[in-house]
Swiss-Prot record:
Keywords: Disulfide bond, Knottin, Plant defense. It comes from the Eukaryota. SUPFAM superfamilies: Cyclotides. This is Cyclotide vibi-H. Belongs to the cyclotide family. Bracelet subfamily. This is a cyclic peptide. Disulfide bonds join 5-21, 9-23, 14-28. The keyword Transmembrane helix does not apply. Signal peptide: none annotated. It holds the Pfam family Cyclotide. It comes from Viola biflora (Yellow wood violet).
Length: 31
């Protein structure tokens, strides 16, 4: 499922990509 990573990506990319999160609909989610 998609779990919110408590990070938005409206202005900057997701820093949480290092733990497997990605940007979707202006919010970072973990797949």
């Amino acid at each position: 499922g998609l779990l919110p990573c408590a990070e938005s990506c409206v202005y900057i990319p997701c820093l949480t990509t290092v733990i497997g999160c990605s940007c979707k609909s202006k919010v970072c989610y973990k797949n």
